[in-house]
UniProtKB/Swiss-Prot annotation:
Keyword Ribonucleoprotein attached: no
This protein's name: ATP synthase subunit beta
Self-association state and partner proteins as the record states: F-type ATPases have 2 components, CF(1) - the catalytic core - and CF(0) - the membrane proton channel. CF(1) has five subunits: alpha(3), beta(3), gamma(1), delta(1), epsilon(1). CF(0) has three main subunits: a(1), b(2) and c(9-12). The alpha and beta chains form an alternating ring which encloses part of the gamma chain. CF(1) is attached to CF(0) by a central stalk formed by the gamma and epsilon chains, while a peripheral stalk is formed by the delta and b chains.
Top-level taxonomic group: Bacteria
Catalytic activity: ATP + H2O + 4 H(+)(in) = ADP + phosphate + 5 H(+)(out)
Family matches, as SUPFAM superfamilies: C-terminal domain of alpha and beta subunits of F1 ATP synthase (SSF47917), N-terminal domain of alpha and beta subunits of F1 ATP synthase (SSF50615), P-loop containing nucleoside triphosphate hydrolases (SSF52540)
Localization: Cell inner membrane
HAMAP family the record matches: ATP_synth_beta_bact
Protein species of origin: Bordetella parapertussis (strain 12822 / ATCC BAA-587 / NCTC 13253)
Length: 466
């Protein structure tokens, strides 16, 4: 481990000259040691990205590079970025380097782990088909989650990705006796603050480790913070536990990679993304997996730029997931929340051999009815309902009831809506939708199905409306 000298600074990219025979390795962490620098107290860390030859390495600063100048001294650590792991991280908020940012003293952990780890070998993997009940009707019905699976919440700006994720945390993490890790990647600090207080009020803070690299931080932090959170989750998994791993937002991880790639001088590819997009996504996603010792169930929010699902970033994320929950602006505009599109959302678990014949038939019946309504919408807009055949009129009436019954009051939105949140079991969800599809609710007004939990509540509401 030798010392080097800064020779160039361009934003977050810093070039450092080392002796030719003692250059640091790729991904090695370097620290600023310049005595006259205010950064020395803060301990600015840099990560080696490229070896340019002649003893010069190109690094990314994991922190603000304001005030850096040529000639400053940098020391090699001889190892990649390592973060504390284990039980000492629970109930704490950390940054990308595993340093506490909650003003609650040092992290009580004896073990540190490098954030760059190989993915588990093929023979260590353990696929699972056990269902994970979420208590959210539309998700449990049309895109059920698997324990140890990977789930993506796709949506544009302001359609409810974070609220849906918070509700899933509320319903799963609180019922689930295991541990959770939350990685806030390039999102709003306010949301991280809300999340912390929510966990504190629910008395589950001692089961959650939180890692944040928020919007205002340099791209190096946002690029590596997902790996920091994942390293903590992997430690719990390797101890034989079932872990929930929440990431908000995977798109910001890609975006940080784009910023870093441009600063490193790589030629951009489609839509200006980095040429290594698929590889960077694979490096992260291949590690989020379940092994024979324990499982990681991952729920990831994915921002969709300009509501375009064919954009390279969401498109690259799709191929790694078991369940995709697509949030639609059109459904949100109707006032139906959660704004999940039941026709666009899908899951590998929606198979009669996994969920059972009844669940499969009800889910497909719901989708067929909604698809028929979608096809008839243009005719209704031009000619009106009167021109439809009796069968089509019935399909439209049922579809509108289904659409409203897919809405549900959330626990985490109680403070905004004033309606108490509802948790609906899978059996109740299937029973309710089966009754609508089979025509047992044809006499009820469609308003009775809006923002209720079970089908029994819809019958109660219908009595009040009459």
């Amino acid at each position: 481990m030798s010392n080097g000298t800064i020779v160039q600074c361009i934003g977050a990219v810093v070039d450092i000259q080392f002796p030719r025979d003692n250059m640091p390795k790729i991904y090695e962490a370097l620290t600023l040691v310049d005595e006259g620098s205010s950064f020395a107290e803060k301990g600015l860390t840099l990560e080696v990205q490229q070896q340019l030859g002649d003893g010069v390495v190109r690094t990314i600063a994991l922190g603000s590079s304001d005030g850096l100048r040529r000639g400053m001294q940098v020391a090699g650590t001889g190892a990649p970025i390592s973060v504390p792991v284990g039980h000492g991280t629970l109930g704490r908020i950390m940054d990308v380097l595993g340093r506490p940012i909650d003003e609650a003293g040092p992290i009580a952990s004896d073990e540190k782990r490098a954030i760059h780890q190989p993915a588990p070998r093929f023979d260590e993997l353990s696929p699972s088909v056990e269902l994970l009940e979420t208590g959210i009707k539309v998700i449990d019905l049309v895109c059920p989650f698997a324990k140890g699976g990977k789930v993506g919440l796709f949506g544009g700006a302001g359609v409810g990705k974070t609220v849906n994720m918070m509700e899933l945390i509320n319903n799963i993490a609180k019922q689930h006796s295991g541990l959770s890790v939350f990685a806030g990647v390039g999102e709003r600090t306010r949301e991280g603050n809300d999340f912390y207080h929510e966990m504190e009020e629910s008395n589950v803070l001692d089961k959650v480790a939180m890692v944040f690299g928020q919007m205002n931080e340099p791209p190096g932090n946002r690029l590596r913070v997902a790996l920091t959170g994942l390293t903590m989750a992997e430690k719990f998994r390797d101890e034989g536990r079932d872990i929930l791993f929440f990431v908000d937002n995977i798109y910001r991880y890609t975006l940080a990679g784009t910023e870093v790639s441009a600063l490193l001088g790589r030629m951009p590819s489609a839509v200006g993304y980095q040429p290594t997009l698929a590889e960077e996504m694979g490096v992260l996603q291949e590690r989020i997996t379940s092994t024979k010792t324990g499982s990681i169930t991952s729920i990831q929010a994915v921002y969709v730029p300009a509501d375009d699902l064919t954009d390279p970033s969401p498109a690259t994320t799709f191929q790694h997931l078991d369940s995709t929950v697509v949030l639609s602006r059109d459904i949100a505009a109707l006032g139906i929340y959660p704004a999940v599109d039941p026709l666009d959302s899908s899951s590998r678990q929606l198979d009669p051999q996994v969920v059972g014949e009844e669940h499969y038939q009800v889910a497909r019946g719901v989708q067929q009815t909604l698809q028929r309504y979608k096809e008839l919408r243009d005719i209704i807009a031009i000619l009106g309902m009167d021109e439809l055949s009796p069968e089509d009129k019935q399909a439209v009436a049922r579809a509108r009831k289904i659409q409203r019954f897919l809405s549900q009051p959330f626990h985490v939105a109680e403070v905004f809506t004033g309606s108490p949140g509802k948790y609906v079991s899978l059996a109740e969800t299937i029973r309710g939708f089966k009754m609508i599809v089979d025509g047992e609710c044809d006499a009820l007004p469609e308003q009775a199905f809006y923002m209720v939990g079970t089908i029994d509540e819809a019958f109660e509401k219908a009595k009040k409306l009459q």
